[in-house]
Swiss-Prot record:
It is found in: Cell membrane; Cell junction, Gap junction. The keyword Transmembrane applies. The gene is inx-14. Its main location: membrane. The chain crosses the membrane at residues 30-50, 106-126, 301-321, 365-385. It comes from Caenorhabditis elegans. Structural component of the gap junctions. Belongs to the pannexin family. It is a multi-pass membrane protein. Keywords: Cell junction, Cell membrane, Gap junction, Ion channel, Ion transport, Membrane, Transmembrane, Transmembrane helix, Transport. This is Innexin-14. The keyword Cell membrane applies.
Amino acid sequence: MIWEIPIIGDFITKPFKAAKLYEFYDRLHLFTVYLLGFFVLLTGAKQHFGNPIDCMLPKQHDDLKSWRDYIHNFCLFYGTFRYDVSNGTSEFGSYTEDASVNYYQWVPFFFAFQVCCFLLPFWCWAYMQKLIYIDMAFIVDYSGKINSEKTFEKTKEKVDRIVNYMHDHFKFRRAHKMGYLSWITFNSAFPSVLYSLTKLFFITNVIIQVNLVCKFLDVDSWTWGFDLLGKFIHPTPRAPEFSSFSDKQRFAAILTDGSYNRFQYFPILVGCEYQLQESVSNFVNHKAQCIIPMNVINEKIFIGLYFWLLVLTALSVIGTVKWILRIKSKKLNEVMIYKLIKKSLEREPFDSNIHDHRYNFVHKYLCADGILLIYFMMDTNGFLKTEEVIGALFKKYCSDAGLEPLQTAPTLTSSPRDLAYSETNYGFAAPQKI
């Protein structure tokens, strides 16, 4: 299968492997990838293995299978045209700019292109995660498996491992700020900035996709979906004198009232003009009446996709605004983390410095990147598993802070030569000589 090809498989599945670092609104875009993939298979199977077009041919052409197959394939890939309806009668038109219908053969490829477009923000976010100094995806994944062990000792061992890993990164975060770029990549706000850019990328992409659908169907207004929905709900009634029409007038009325061509962008009954060489020097033009059964499917798919993209745009904007307000609100972050460490506080004896430890834990120890990580853990693993890990992390922080209170931002030691090495002083304890 294509997934087993090393380069292609990694290129496609990489966003799904990093799918743990998303919130609910981002996973809607991942759902859209699956939805569009299903549309690719559905329309592609109908077009390449089904019966995408049927034409009513003259007897001399229909009797010869080679000619019949040739004409059907020609009309499918070269394109068709709409009927010209005027003055209550219909007649064959021609391949004019307004009448031509030639998008339907590209529908599976268009959906495949959209799949790549929706995967692009996930690919970018998966790459940007490598720029973050802490492996958030590993922490979220490992935290979700802490209760998979059968014994309490094994579970506690897993919790201690992940807590020690997180503690080392948060405690010594600034030890790596030695270069110009490191002041950016090791800044606590850097992961939040990258994730905010990713969310803006999601919004930009879905807005572009709405416009691409309109361009692909050659519609002038982005409200075409509402027009089509209105025709479904309130179809145009037939004229009272329909029963007295001639056959040609009835056929024209059917074309205009929507029984076969409910909406002009998805015509079912079309015409096709083809040329056959019936002798060495004799080329004869023919016109055939055709139906496009796949447009029945395309009509439902595109109207559903149109409204889903509009809903997705609205939800993405709401989710991004909520995310920015949430990550910027000190009060909300404090309340969220206090709930996670509440159980740990109840089990410990009263400490007069606990309020200072709690505040420093949120704003000087976790900072913006730690808070972002906790949001990912809660969205993926739930409250209980996150509570167990963060509660243990807070205990470890307090055990260190109780002996070595964290008061100020770390500074480099002023006399590294006297100490035989240079290190970052975090305010926990004075560095000892070797």
